[in-house]
């Protein structure tokens, strides 16, 4: 028997209070199955948002000293997946403020799209990371196996070609379609050592 998760109907939130040293804000949105054409736009969007010193969330959160690090998760699956931004807060920073900055960064792309430079940089980063990840027979076998798990081995062979075909409008369209409240789940990890949030 094979079942599918029902469509999400409205925003979800969770706060975890436990012992720890680093507070975290995570903002997740539902994504389509990995073989959907929007997967490639999501991959590039994750690069634009959080990969490298020129990424938008780096400039919005790391450079001003609001967060110590970022992590973006957008791994494709056979079923629906998640597009998640994680921000690891500097001591004393406010969870709500960090969440708003992440969402405002999304909204800027929803409203105004991305630049040509951002698109080309994201594609170059992707090509480099894919080449590195396919270095060696074990790595190639593992990547093909992942493609099979998603549902089609040609996901491996056509990935870069489809990345190259993504346009600025594709990324803006994906942001408008998926980065919405009805597909959003927000999580806060609040350390018991931090009483400021």
Protein language model regions, located:
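C-terminal soluble interaction/assembly domains
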Residues: 110, 122, 156-157
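Hydrophobic alpha-helical membrane-association signature
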Residues: 98-102
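Non-catalytic beta-strand/loop surface segments
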Residues: 1-36, 47-96, 118-128, 139-143, ...
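C-terminal, helix-dominated tail/subdomain
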Residues: 145-152, 163
């Amino acid at each position: 028997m094979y079942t599918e998760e029902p469509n999400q109907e409205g925003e979800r939130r969770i706060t975890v209070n436990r012992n720890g040293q680093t507070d975290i804000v995570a903002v997740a949105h539902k994504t389509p199955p990995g073989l959907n054409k929007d997967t490639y736009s999501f991959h590039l969007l994750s690069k634009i948002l959080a990969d490298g010193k020129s990424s938008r969330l780096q400039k919005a959160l790391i450079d001003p000293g609001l967060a110590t690090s970022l992590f973006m998760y957008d791994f494709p699956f056979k079923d629906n997946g998640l597009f998640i931004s994680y921000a690891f807060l500097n001591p004393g920073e406010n969870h709500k403020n960090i969440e708003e900055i992440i969402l405002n960064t999304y909204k800027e792309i929803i409203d105004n799209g991305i630049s040509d430079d951002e698109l080309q940089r994201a594609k170059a980063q992707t090509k480099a990371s894919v080449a590195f990840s396919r270095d060696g027979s074990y790595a190639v076998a593992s990547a093909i196996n992942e493609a099979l798990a998603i549902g089609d081995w040609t996901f491996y062979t056509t990935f870069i070609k489809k990345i190259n075909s993504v346009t600025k409008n594709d990324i803006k369209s994906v942001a408008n379609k998926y980065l919405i409240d009805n597909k959003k789940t927000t999580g806060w990890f609040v350390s018991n050592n931090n009483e400021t949030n």
